[in-house]
Amino acid sequence: WLATALACSALALTACGGQSNNASAPADKVYRVGSNAEFAPFESLDSAGKVEGFDVDLMDAMAKAGNFKVEFKHQPWESLFPSLNNGDVDIVMSGVTITDDRKQSMLFSDPYFEITQVVLVPKGKKVASSEDLKNMAKVGVVTGYTGDFSVSKLLGNDNPKIARFESVPLIIKELENGGLDSVVSDSAVIANYVKNNPTKGLDFISLPDFTIENYGIAARKGDEATIKMLNDALKKVRESGEYDKIYAKYFAKEGEKTEAAK
C-alpha cells in the first residue's frame, strides 16, 4: 500500500441520447484511478502486473453501468492523495476510509464498504481490549491508515512502541518474523489474509474499542460532477444485484466465519 504499474479497464462507452448532465462523462474521458495495490483482497497485482481485486471489479461494474472508462494506476499509498490533488489521477479508490479530516481536502462518494480495525496476533495470544496494546513492546501499523490513527490516539503519536510500515504485506511479514507483538489494520484485509494463510499461525481479534468505518471513493475538492457520476453508478450496481455478486466473490456471506474469526 511499490513500483508503479498501469492497469487499464477500458469498458465500452456509448453516447447517451438526450442532453448531457453533471453525471455524464465526456465521450473521450478516461478516469485515472489511483490505487495502492498492496491491500488484498481490495487491490493487488496479478502475475502480469495488472491491478485486480474487489475495488477493481466494483469500479469496472460501475463504469459499465455509468458509461464511463477507467484506468487503474498502482502507486505507493503515501503518494495517492498528493497525486489526486495535483491532477495525476482523477479518482482514488484504495480502501480509503471516509474521515472528517480527509473531507477537508477531498470529496467522497457514498460509502461502498463497511469495516472496522482488528488486532492481528500469533495464535493463542490473548487481547481482551485495546488497553492490552499498551503492554506490548511493539504494535505495528501502516503509516497513514486508520489503524495508525487509532493506535496513535491510544498510545500517543510519538510512542516508540508504535512501529510504522509502508504496506500491509511488510507489516504482516514483520509480525510473522517475530519483530512485532501485534498488528492493527482493516478487518476485511486481515480476515482475508488469515483465511488464505492458515499455516502462518495467526489469528485476529475484534475489539469494541474500534468503531465502524466506511470506505469511499475520493475525488478532488470541487469535482462534484465526478462524485455524482460515481454515486449514480454505485446506486445502479447495488440495485442490479451486481454489488452482491462481486462481494460474494471475495468475502464470506453474512453469518459465515472462518476458523480464525472466532
Language-model segments: which ranges?
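A ligand-binding cleft/hinge motif common to bilobed small-molecule-binding domains
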Residues: V96-Q104, S150-K153, E176, D181-T211
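Bilobed "Venus flytrap"/periplasmic-binding protein-like clamshell domains
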Residues: E38, V51-A61, V118-L170, S182, ...
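Extended ligand-binding regions for polar small-molecule ligands
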Residues: G17, V56-A65, T143-Y145, G216-E254
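Periplasmic-binding protein-like
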Residues: A37, E114-V121, S187, A191, ...
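Extracytoplasmic small-molecule ligand-binding "clamshell" domains
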Residues: A25-G95
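Acidic, polar ligand-binding/catalytic clefts
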Residues: K64, K69-L133, D203, P208-D209
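Short helix-initiation/N-cap motifs at beta->coil->alpha
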Residues: V56, F72-S83, I162-N177, E213
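C-terminal motif of bacterial Sec signal peptides marking the signal peptidase cleavage site
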Residues: A12-A15
